[in-house]
């Protein structure tokens, strides 16, 4: 393949999806500026967007101002848009969607995924260009991918190219301006230039299909970005079609996927399964009181070894197995408590 042919593939992929990428502008009414923290345009906003809440002069009382921006992409011609939850996290904000042709629409947040950095936004429009959704389970390390989005909140529909650098990564990222941390497991790692502003935009393959949603970076690191696998979003879209909301099963515990390293470090009986344990957050609990897990009698330091008779493999998160189940399903768990094996069962609830 000569250089012309090599360049043609990403060029054609970008042409195919470019019309379906949107910018999302975040605006808020500022009732007072007393005590407010204002970020000059030349300094990055530590809350995650490099957009200043004022242009040269502070806002006056009651004025609506732009406080941030992100990206998204159209998945249905009637105005259904995928983006990141952290882009549209603020329930007090107003969201304006700017399509590739420069038209502006009021954006209504239809749903926010309770366990992933995914949100669905709706605009009132017809016959919009749509980006096809690929299959994120068929990705391979080294595969070429392309990110498109509202780079740094300033440069609309910027394009960058790279590869899939890793699969099934686990990260913790700040969600919104309140500093709440969200733990994302099973995300894609890429060396594509992902930054504040192009979060929520599509990560596409050379066929012009979205295989991920750009979501996070590691500040201070070069060429390390992360994306949500598109198959997670497909399930959310199916839920919205069926129920009008995103529905996720809830067991009610925190757990650590086990491997040989953790087995040796903590002198555990097994190198696979899910260790029920609280995390580092203040007031964290391993088992949520009153939850299905609590009613089943699961306790901190239990090791869950099997789910519905299926052994939990090494380095496998329990959440990945729960994704196969639905609200209202009975779940049978085998647990190891000290040296005693126990079998329990409970009914999954809807995560709120």
Model-inferred region functions:
Residues 1-265, 271-272, 350-352:
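Serine-dependent protease modules
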Residues 11-12, 85, 235-352:
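C-terminal recognition in membrane/secretory proteostasis and scaffolding
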């Amino acid at each position: 393949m000569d250089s012309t042919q090599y360049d043609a593939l990403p060029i054609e992929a970008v042409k195919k999806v470019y019309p379906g990428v949107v910018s999302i502008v975040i605006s808020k009414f500022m009732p007072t500026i007393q005590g407010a923290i204002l970020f000059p345009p030349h300094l990055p906003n530590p809350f995650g967007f490099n957009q200043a809440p004022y242009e040269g002069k502070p806002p006056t009382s009651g004025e609506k101002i732009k406080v941030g921006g992100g990206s998204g992409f159209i998945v249905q011609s009637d105005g259904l848009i995928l983006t990141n939850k952290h882009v549209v996290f603020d329930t007090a904000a107003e969201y304006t969607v700017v399509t590739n042709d420069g038209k502006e629409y009021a954006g209504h947040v239809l749903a926010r995924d309770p366990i992933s950095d995914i949100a669905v936004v709706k605009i009132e429009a017809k016959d919009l260009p749509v980006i096809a959704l690929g299959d994120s389970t068929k990705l391979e390390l080294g595969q070429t991918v392309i990110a498109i989005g509202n780079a740094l909140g300033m440069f609309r529909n910027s394009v960058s190219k790279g590869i899939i650098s890793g699969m099934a990564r686990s990260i913790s990222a700040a969600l919104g301006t309140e500093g709440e941390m969200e733990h994302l497991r099973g995300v894609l790692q890429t060396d594509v230039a992902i930054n504040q502003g192009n979060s929520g935009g599509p990560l596409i393959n050379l066929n012009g299909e979205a295989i991920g949603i750009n979501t996070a970076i590691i500040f201070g690191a070069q060429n390390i970005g992360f994306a949500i696998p598109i198959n997670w979003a497909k399930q959310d879209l199916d839920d919205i079609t069926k129920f009008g909301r995103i529905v996720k099963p809830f067991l009610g515990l925190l757990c650590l996927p086990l491997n040989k390293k953790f087995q040796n470090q903590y002198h555990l009986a097994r190198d696979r399964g899910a260790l029920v344990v609280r995390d580092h957050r203040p007031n964290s609990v391993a088992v949520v009181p009153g939850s299905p897990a609590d009613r089943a009698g699961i306790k901190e330091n239990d090791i869950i070894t099997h789910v519905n008779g299926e052994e939990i493999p090494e380095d496998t998160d329990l959440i990945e197995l729960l994704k196969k189940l639905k609200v209202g399903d009975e779940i049978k768990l085998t647990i190891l408590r000290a040296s005693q094996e126990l079998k329990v069962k409970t009914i999954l609830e809807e995560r709120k």
